[in-house]
Amino acid sequence: MRGTMTRVMATGTFDILHPGHLLYLERSRALGDELVVVVARDINVKHKPRPVVPEDQRLRMVSALKMVDMAVLGSVTDIFEPVRALRPDIITLGYDQYMDENWLEGELRKRGLMARVVRISEREPCELCSSRQIVEKILKERC
């Protein structure tokens, strides 16, 4: 920790921003004094369809959110690079992020990084609270 300041790091793709993203970031921000967000690089998104919105635009959108103090693009080669550079006290994962908390904490410790991992399990109850749902609705109604 930086004195009494707690830095929280949230990560994600943030493709087609929606209320679910906002809830995740609001809950993440509430855990500390500063929220830094790592936006996934286009090339690194392999666990789901590639983002519709390019990484530079996703970064710009996330940076503009009032609860976000800083947003950066992730590393192309090493997911731990931004963690080493920004030294968060807490790393949050969204309810649907595929990363296992125990594995992540173990990997952080191996690298001498002491951030605590917190899963934000709350979900926003809305019809279009995922980028996939938004894309599917657009395809259904507009194509």
Curated annotation (Swiss-Prot):
Listed InterPro entries: Archaeal_FAD_synthase (IPR050385), Cyt_trans-like (IPR004821), FAD_synth_RibL (IPR024902), Rossmann-like_a/b/a_fold (IPR014729)
GO biological process: FAD biosynthetic process; FMN metabolic process
Annotated protein name in UniProt: FAD synthase
This protein's record includes keyword Flavoprotein: yes
Gene3D superfamilies: HUPs (3.40.50.620)
EC number: 2.7.7.2
Pfam families (UniProt xref): CTP_transf_like (PF01467)
